[in-house]
Amino acid sequence: MEVSEGSVTVEVPEERHGASEGSGEGVFYNPVQELNRDITAAVLRTVSDDCDEYLDAMAASGIRSVRAAAAGYDVTACDIDDDAVALTRRNLDRNGVDGTVHHRNVNAHMHESAHDVVDLDPFGTPMAFADAAVRSAGEYLCVTATDTAPLCGAHFESGVRSYDAVPRNTEFHAEMGLRVLLSALVRTAARHDIAAEPVLSHVTSHYVRTYLRVDSGARAADALLEHLGYIDHCQRCLWRDHERGRVPDPTTTCPHCGQSTWTAGPVWLGPAHDAAFVDDVAGAIPDSFGTADKARDLLSTVATELHQPTHYDQHKLYKRWNEPNIAMDDFLAALRAAGHEASRTHYGGTTFKTDADVADIRNAVE
């Protein structure tokens, strides 16, 4: 079958929804990831003045490679699947664009070759490729993770094993997954004296996607490590707190309701995006992209999110309070009127961030 994205048309063997249907056998095309690919294409447009070379680390159908090549990038693609290599070459040819396609283990390739932009889009965890990727990426590292259950703590042991962190399955589980992933990537880069700083991140349709600007130097890496720390969370009243540091000093009892608390970490507590960069990416999305409106809406919300490391769900708070909820706009206005910062988030229509704690939130909206 044929599919079109952006300005390219490619041959794909079958559609499969990735995380929801499993990796399956052989090469497949995931239509749910079109938003991911559209935003990636916009990122490549945004950074094109500084970047020329793009590595598609898991080529599959080659659609990422073809779109990058059509944008003027010097493209290299890797895959260990014979069919994927052949299909990627055909799709480059049919679109009249150039690219080098390697049939080899991408870790071996990344250890030997540098690229301005490295794009990791595996099925499952990206951590098996992270060490090689941070060394190969000269300017930007783009990473997808589809193993959201381990990342958010729903599959606890797998999350600990894959990300060397304690994830917790909280009501802000999507952001928990993002911050566990960012922590693992930042720590991996720092081991190689590389600073990997997130400039755009989102959690959409059972996957986490982040873009990190990379720079070499132990001091820069050390500075980013200062943004690692731990989150304490109460499952009963939804109180939470966070503390930066390498060694956890957990609050074991909730100061608000007395319930025993959970501690997660080390997680990334710093900004997950750079608002100016996100705005530039949104401005680089043309109307011809299939998910243009959705991508712009998503990025608009991401750009205005506060940098607090956790978000709340308004409906879940009101459920705990056993009260009917009010309109979100009125809710956020009440928080701001009480002197607090507040913003919507991209994690859901009733999610928000604020610098207020649970008690202050309730006082502000009563």
UniProtKB/Swiss-Prot annotation:
Its EC number is 2.1.1.216. GO terms for biological process: tRNA N2-guanine methylation. It comes from the Archaea. Keywords: Metal-binding, Methyltransferase, RNA-binding, S-adenosyl-L-methionine, Transferase, tRNA processing, tRNA-binding, Zinc. One of its GO terms (molecular function) is tRNA binding. Residues 1-28 are annotated as: Disordered. SUPFAM superfamilies: S-adenosyl-L-methionine-dependent methyltransferases. InterPro entries: SAM-dependent_MTases_sf, Trm1, TRM1_arc_bac, tRNA_met_Trm1_C. Zn(2+) binds at C234, C237, C254, C257. Residues 1-365 form the Trm1 methyltransferase domain. It catalyses: guanosine(26) in tRNA + 2 S-adenosyl-L-methionine = N(2)-dimethylguanosine(26) in tRNA + 2 S-adenosyl-L-homocysteine + 2 H(+). S-adenosyl-L-methionine binds at R37, R64, D79. HAMAP family: tRNA_dimethyltr_TRM1. Belongs to the class I-like SAM-binding methyltransferase superfamily. Trm1 family. Dimethylates a single guanine residue at position 26 of a number of tRNAs using S-adenosyl-L-methionine as donor of the methyl groups. This is tRNA (guanine(26)-N(2))-dimethyltransferase. It comes from Natronomonas pharaonis (strain ATCC 35678 / DSM 2160 / CIP 103997 / JCM 8858 / NBRC 14720 / NCIMB 2260 / Gabara). The lineage of its organism: Archaea, Methanobacteriati, Methanobacteriota, Stenosarchaea group, Halobacteria.
